[in-house]
Amino acid sequence: MRRALGPVTANGLAVLSLVIVLGTSWRWLSLTLVLVTLAANLALHGTRGLGRFIVSHTILAAGALAAYARRMPDEVDWAFCVAAALIMSFISMENRLGRLAEPAFRTRHLRTRARPLRRVLNDTTIYLADCALIVLVAAAAIVALPSWVLLVGALGVGILYAGLLVDSLYTKRHRDGGRGDLTRALEHYQPEFYLHWDGAPDATYQIFMWLPYLERLDRRFVIVLRDRRSFAPVAAATGRPVVLCPTIASIEAAIVPSLRCVFYVNNGVRNGHIVRFHELTHVQLLHGDSEKTASYNPVNAMFDELFVAGRAAIDRYARNGVDMPRDKFRIVGRPQVESVEVATTPIAGISNRTVLYAPTWTGLFTDTNHCSLPIGARILRELFARGATVILRAHPMTSSNSRAAAHLAELERILAEDRAVSGRRHVWGAAASAGQFVDWANRADAMIADISSVISDFLYSEKPFAVTDMNGDLVSAVPVTRGAYVIRGDASNVAEVVDNLLGADPLADVRRAVKTYYLGDFAAEGYAEAFLTAARQVIDAPRRHELSKPHDPASAPAVRC
């Protein structure tokens, strides 16, 4: 919503500014709107707005230039005309200039040689330079600066952009776009494996859930990103080397002799760009075990190995008509649940019960929409009626759908009202989103969730949980429901479900068997070692073209299927 409203609001303010300057004598108000619009764009979107506000910048510049022109005498001022032409040209070429300034790759926590000009001139500099030109014109109109000041400012920015063009042409013709610098830096670092990720900034949790366990492998590795927008947040959150490789050519430059294995945590479209390097071992981890289509996507056949939590993940492919070779699977458990505390007291014996409500997002397609937020109010009121405290932990991507975001806002309002009346310390919003899922799972006595990976994670605790069936086919399609209380999509049985969830809990014994089926039969002590050992084995294996004989899966400590 914020991404959509930003340019719309900026365009509206810019048009208003232009109308005022052309149709009224309120020049000060118009120029004030110019400055307010630029300041608002910077405040809301930082310095990463290159190309997003071309329309508003063009209108703002035109309005400021018109305000300046109205103060000029009737004769032609050639300095002003040239300056105006240059300024409007620079703004209209923001996207093209940004592409010239965009390096072939970016790195953080990895030593590379950077040319001095590229350290100074990048997409941020171009964006700020264009904003500065608009501010200069507005200031000149306010204090009646001579036109040669505008011309000098425009020429200065033009010289900077000309240097960018020359540097870009030289780099492309003589230095392979600078990709040789990346290869040399990686050869010096000698990574043994990569974590490859193609995703948007609001999905970085997919990386961070695996990062602690990859760090425990005690091997040199690099996080390879494909989406430019994700570079800054990921690079700021880890001390590990991070490389942005937006193109196929930059990926090719990242394949170095020390590299033996690549791990993946989603079904990103650009995974195929690096999977084609057959001398490497490619392992799909995914970002959770669930009944969503991502967990049985046929595209996973392109990977050499599929690390899965338990037998349920293997059977899921066959149950959904996906023919996946069994020798690709390796059962390694779900290391993220190693800190989940197993229940020791029946829920009926707990007086002040806390329930975690974890609705998922709407997904990108109809068949992946399992979101229960439309019936969330009914669920909350049944929990309130039984004196439960609620933790509402929504999916990080809930706000990507405006209707889901509105439902979530309504639920948060209901929680706030009940907290004010009852004194129960409900948790929602940023507070509930902080930390890891395991932290809230340990705090809760029961859970209500939609179809998502949080079910498998919570299953480890052996605590009672309910699952929403928004599409009406859950019981027959999903084995996890054997250990869950199922809420119908119309919420017609929610009262009965909550009674079982917080009362007798007749599915307690069944739930323990389902836990093994989904999360593997590994001892609680050292549970994550199954994954760590399997990952080390893959990393330590020689490259495929160096193999003298086929890899023996029987030597793996994790379960091979």
What are these regions (language model features)?
Residues 406-456:
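Donor nucleotide-activated moiety binding/catalytic core segment of transferases
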Residues 241-250, 330-333, 425-432, 483-503:
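Short acidic-hydrophobic, aromatic-tinged amphipathic segments that line or gate anion-handling sites
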Residues 72, 194-337:
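Active-site and donor-binding regions of nucleotide-sugar-utilizing enzymes
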Residues 201-217, 338-414, 520-529, 551, ...:
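Conserved catalytic-core segment of nucleotide-activated headgroup transferases in glycan assembly
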Residues 154-177, 302-371:
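A nucleotide-sugar donor-handling region in carbohydrate enzymes
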